[in-house]
Amino acid sequence: MLTDAHKRHLSNILQPVSPPRELHNVYTEDQRRRLLDVVHSGAWKLIIAQHFPNAEALIATFAGGFPEGFEPTLDMFLTPTFRGFYANYSTCMFPEIQDTFYNPTFLEYAKSYWNADYAKPQMMLFNVNGPCGNKDPGHLDSPSFRGVRYENSPTWLCSIMGRSGLFQDYLIKMAQVITWFSHDPNSGFTYWPKGPLEKPARLQPPVYNRGVVVQNEMLVHRGEANGPVERQNPKGLGFDSLFSGEPGNPDGWLVKTGDQVIERYHTDDLRFLVHWSAEVFEDYAELKKNMDGSDNLTYDQVFDTLIKDVRSRGIQIETPTDPLNDPAFIKALNDAYDYGGPAEYPADAPRELVAA
């Protein structure tokens, strides 16, 4: 168990470089339609199925808040939220939406947020769901570090590195423009700008074509449940469920498990999130260092640093033979940097508890 003082220390690490900046009318109606058309043309996996091989890896991205002795399973966190990528590695994969990714306005937002000289678009994704609960107590987006990036490393590891505060000199500066399209009058966005043990703030609903400029890798945050409760957990949802457009109906959407349609939505039912992310460089020297690989971390360096830090606090931790895939090791690291979860939630957006 961590002391209250150390939990407070960990909480204080998790503050973005600037508070979130609210935006309105982020995309044009034409851009929104084209972004949705890409979604309509594909079949998209659950977020949880794409990123997490086991419950320990998922829990490592959360902001704590689970009781001692809690034994998680992935099924406990199964919700009908799906993800796809519009762009990655600074490359847009769909020509019809290039203007939304190579976006000069967004680049100016990113540079201004950091007071930096340079920025480049890095990644763009969407999350989409119909009516859906939210069992997430609060989480961090996956940070990247020189040599250990979200593209080449497990999400859980990047999250723990960020929460530890031990690798700040290697942290790649990022800024996001996060935009929501949701008509739900009760579904907003909760975040903790001064750290998760301080007061929360909230982007008030409805959040249709509204957004924020943020550093989500160092900002504990959570989406909020949306839609009628009785439709939030479709019967038959599984890890192989897919989200796709209904053929011949541009505003029709399907959730399928195998060949079976388990739920249907209209566009107006959706909570549709578009996440645009840029790498930001304070000056040319930082740009060069990030690009030429001259000051990169290695996995050996990362695990050595983490293990030494944990042991220096009198916590026992084994040196694993396969640190990237050892559930017991992942749990031990997560416990060592677990500040206990957000201390408070907005009265209008309480946390949905996970049933054991």
List each model region and its residues.
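Non-heme Fe(II)-dependent double-stranded beta-helix
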Residues: 2-8, 30-113, 124-126, 133-136
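Cationic-aromatic interfacial patches
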Residues: 5-16, 25
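Glycine-rich, often proline-containing surface loops adjacent to acidic residues and nearby aromatics
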Residues: 15-19, 82-93, 121, 174, ...
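Short amphipathic
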Residues: 21-27
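Charged, glycine/proline-rich intrinsically disordered loops and linkers
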Residues: 50-80, 139-161, 226-261
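Catalytic core of non-heme Fe(II) oxygenases with the double-stranded beta-helix
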Residues: 111-121, 131-240
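A structural signal for short, well-ordered beta-strand segments
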Residues: 124, 177-179, 274-278
